[in-house]
Amino acid sequence: MARVKRAVNAQKKRRTTLERASGYRGQRSRLYRKAKEQVTHSLGYAYRDRRARKGDFRRLWIQRINAAARANGITYNRFIQGLKAAEVEVDRRMLAELAVSDPAAFTTLVELAKGALPEDVNAPAA
């Protein structure tokens, strides 16, 4: 059986790893072993944070909606409850965008939500 030489493959693997680590500081961008460790961790962080980003944005949208709703005299919880009662299907991303870019339209939605809420706070939603 012929002997398998892996020098080319090994060099390519090392070059690729060092290229991926090109922006890092110190030994992490120059020494293969350090670069390999850092690139492995970096890829793991990227994978994790791509998923975390979705929750981060949802929390940001909720904060923006809550701030705008409170400026209009209603809490976030009651606002969302009122929108559901009024059968308005606008997602939080669009509500946050309206709150920032078009406060008049957001105020209209707040009035709509207030009108759809039951009078008694403790009464179950119909």
Curated annotation (Swiss-Prot):
GO CC terms, sorted: ribonucleoprotein complex; ribosome
Recorded GO MF terms: rRNA binding; structural constituent of ribosome
PROSITE patterns (UniProt xref): RIBOSOMAL_L20 (PS00937)
Gene from which this protein is expressed: rplT
Lineage, opening ranks: Bacteria, Bacillati, Actinomycetota, Actinomycetes, Micrococcales
Composition skew (Basic residues), residue ranges: 1-15
Organism of origin: Beutenbergia cavernae (strain ATCC BAA-8 / DSM 12333 / CCUG 43141 / JCM 11478 / NBRC 16432 / NCIMB 13614 / HKI 0122)
Task of the protein: Binds directly to 23S ribosomal RNA and is necessary for the in vitro assembly process of the 50S ribosomal subunit. It is not involved in the protein synthesizing functions of that subunit.
Region (Disordered) location: 1-20
Superkingdom, natural source: Bacteria
Signal peptide: none
Listed NCBIfam families: rplT_bact
Protein name: Large ribosomal subunit protein bL20
Residue spans crossing the bilayer: none
Residue runs in coiled coils: none
InterPro entries, alphabetized: Ribosomal_bL20 (IPR005813), RIBOSOMAL_L20_CS (IPR049946), Ribosomal_protein_bL20_C (IPR035566)
